[in-house]
């Protein structure tokens, strides 16, 4: 992703939108984690929290969306410089739940059933892909006819 960001997003050639697709059938706490990432965005730390959440699930630091997970997410927030009280209030009041659920419904309508998934100008690209695959598709779309 850093190379894509540098060559396409930072140069203004393309823009990026990130939508939630919490895999609750695998991680029952994924819905809370998606909300935690969005609550972190309110304080300018979306990407760092997102990485922290992914690292945390891999390390089995959280799992089921319980109060223990909320405590873990609050610890993550504090560690990356987020106001913990504001963050926890955002998560516990489900401030972003409607948007997360709307993103999930949109993904399901598009036939997305796993992550990662990418939509590039209407074209669905499933699974992790090398930089060259993204570059080939993007270059074909932005090149003059």
Task: Name every feature range the model reports, one short phrase each.
Residues 1-78, 110, 139-145:
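Structural alpha/beta surface segment adjacent to cysteine/selenocysteine redox centers
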Residues 1-7, 71-145:
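C-terminal cap of thioredoxin/glutaredoxin-like
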């Amino acid at each position: 992703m850093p190379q894509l960001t540098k060559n396409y997003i930072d140069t203004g050639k393309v823009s990026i939108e990130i939508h939630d697709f919490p895999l609750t059938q695998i991680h029952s706490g994924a819905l809370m984690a998606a909300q935690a990432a969005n609550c972190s965005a309110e304080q300018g730390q979306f990407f760092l929290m997102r990485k922290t959440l992914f690292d945390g699930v891999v390390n089995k630091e959280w799992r089921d969306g319980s109060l223990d997970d909320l405590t873990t997410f609050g610890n993550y927030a504090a560690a990356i410089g987020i106001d913990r009280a504001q963050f926890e209030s955002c998560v516990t009041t489900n401030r972003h739940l409607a948007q997360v659920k709307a993103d999930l419904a949109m993904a399901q309508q598009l036939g997305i059933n796993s992550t990662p998934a990418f939509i590039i100008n209407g074209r669905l690209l499933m699974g992790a892909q090398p930089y060259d695959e993204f570059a080939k598709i993007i270059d074909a779309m932005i090149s003059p006819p």
